[in-house]
Curated annotation (Swiss-Prot):
Record keywords: DNA integration, DNA recombination, Plasmid
Biased composition (Polar residues): 429-439, 446-468
Annotated protein name in UniProt: Recombinase Flp protein
Lyase in keyword set: no
Database matches in PROSITE patterns: TYR_RECOMBINASE_FLP (PS51899)
This protein's record includes keyword Iron: no
Length: 474
């Protein structure tokens, strides 16, 4: 159990009592534990003062605790606790702590982030001297360049996928990075939204343009607005369903991390917490893309920004927002205030034509309707003839412990789709039939664009780290 999970289970007055016990027993003072308790007590009071009592988030606790721990000092002779806290005015905080944790005194200084004078002067010097860096520090400008055209957008995704293939050593890391890249982009979502998806909620839903697709529910989001993550058929490499199948082969169920002081609503999450940090470091080090070289620029979270900009450039701006939740027209007959204040509790789904557009199987006609990009292939007809396996034992062997968490019907569909799709990608004749559009939505999905005429294939080692069966055993 993490320290945060332990602390949220301790009642506030019991936290105060533990602080008093620590201060009264003398040297050695466990400063790290004291810093954690003080931070939790302060955040509990601050959050409870809001009109709607807000939960204490793990990220908030970690940020404030770090500053407290670095500066914490206890003077036993005067019974005074010294530390820094991120507030403009700490007078009320000092008085509150002395009232709640009597008879001890508190001196709380304002924490200020140190300024790198040399860096600031150098930056101003370069600007005034007329030296412009080749790399733009404007994140928005770089994203606009990437999403300017269909080719520029999908070529960027292609290059990043190729980088992951070439620069990752461990298969587990490779499939996880590919999964993160594709799903945050294709769902216009924050990386944390993808991470917090509940795998036990996977379900098959019917889509008017594509047939059956999968979705998973996300109870926890940064905006506190629940949403879904969607997995739908797409042309070629960038396929959320294929990415999900590969990911579940290598990564078992991930226990849910407690991220707020409220009780967790579910037992498992989709991604490891450390994956986002690992991905950020990998991309910053290995990629030569300008967007990834901007200090503090988006990396794991780039997908939602890029997709929002891409949709905006294709007259679909209302379908996505930079906040990572799909947006729809406000409901008819509902006031603007009601829609913004409480109608978000009604679960909304993106329009089907959005999936059709992103799948690459459809294009927008001059009349504004979405029609098949090529008449030879209709994903609806293909879905109707897809031979869904009923072999649950095979599914249990293939997906291992994931089969105990994810509903069986979702895995049966996923397995069947993935196997058939890989056969198509491995068969040049079938691939040419499927991807012979004059203007494909995903220009990099032809064999020629990979720099080789070798058909795209996927193989797994004979023994997987999760003890699952290999594709050749089916």
């Amino acid at each position: 159990m993490s320290e945060f999970s332990e602390l949220v289970r301790i009642l506030p007055l019991d936290q105060v009592a533990e602080i008093k016990r620590i201060l009264s027993r003398g040297d050695p003072i466990p400063l790290q534990r004291l810093a954690s308790l003080l931070t939790m007590v302060i955040l509990t009071v601050n959050m409870s003062k809001k009109r709607k009592s807000s939960p204490i988030k793990l990220s908030t606790f970690t940020k404030y605790r770090r500053n407290v721990a670095k500066s914490l000092y206890y003077d036993m002779s005067s019974k005074t606790v010294f530390f820094e806290y991120h507030l403009k005015n700490t007078q009320d905080l000092q008085e509150g702590l002395e009232q709640a944790i009597a008879p001890y005194n508190f001196v709380v200084k304002v924490h200020k982030k140190p300024i790198d004078w040399q860096k600031q002067l150098s930056s101003v010097h370069e600007r005034k001297a007329g030296h412009r860096s080749i790399l733009s520090n404007n994140v928005g400008a770089e994203i606009s360049k990437l999403a300017e055209t269909k080719d520029s957008t999908w070529s960027f995704i292609e290059r990043t996928m190729d980088l992951i293939e070439a620069r990752t050593r461990q298969p587990t890391t490779r499939v996880a990075y590919r999964f993160l890249l594709q799903l945050t982009f294709m769902n216009c979502c924050r990386a944390n939204d993808l991470k917090n998806a509940d795998p036990s909620t996977f379900q098959i839903i019917a889509d008017p343009h594509l047939g059956r697709i999968l979705r998973a529910f996300v109870p926890e989001t940064k905006t506190s607005i629940e949403r879904f993550i969607y997995f739908f058929p797409c042309k070629g490499r960038c396929d959320p369903l294929l990415a999900l199948d590969s990911y579940l082969l290598w990564v078992g169920p991930v226990p849910k991390t407690q991220t707020t002081d409220e009780e967790t609503q579910y037992d498992y999450q989709l991604l490891q917490d450390t994956l986002l940090i690992s991905y950020d470091r990998f991309i910053a080090k290995e990629s030569k893309e300008n967007i990834f070289k901007i200090p503090n620029g988006p990396k794991a979270h780039l997908g939602r920004h890029l997709m929002a900009s891409y949709l905006g450039n294709n007259s679909l701006k209302s379908e996505a927002t930079l906040y990572g939740n799909w947006s729809v027209e406000r409901q008819e007959g509902v006031s603007k205030m009601a829609d913004s204040r409480y109608m978000h509790t009604v679960k909304k789904s993106p329009p089907s034509y959005l999936f059709a557009f992103l799948s690459g199987y459809y294009k927008k006609s001059n009349q504004g309707e979405y029609v098949l990009a090529e008449t030879l292939y209709n994903p609806l007809d293909y879905d109707k003839t897809l031979p869904i396996t009923t072999n649950e034992k095979l599914i249990c062997r293939r997906y291992g412990k994931n089969a105990k968490v994810i509903p069986k019907d979702a895995l049966l569909y996923l397995y069947t789709y993935a196997q058939q799709k890989r056969k198509q990608l491995a068969d040049p004749n079938e691939q040419n039939r499927l991807f012979s559009s004059e203007s494909p939505a995903h220009p990099f999905l032809t064999p020629q664009s990979t720099g080789s005429s070798t058909p795209l294939t996927w193989t797994a080692p004979k023994t997987l780290s999760t003890g699952l069966m290999t594709p050749g055993e089916e």
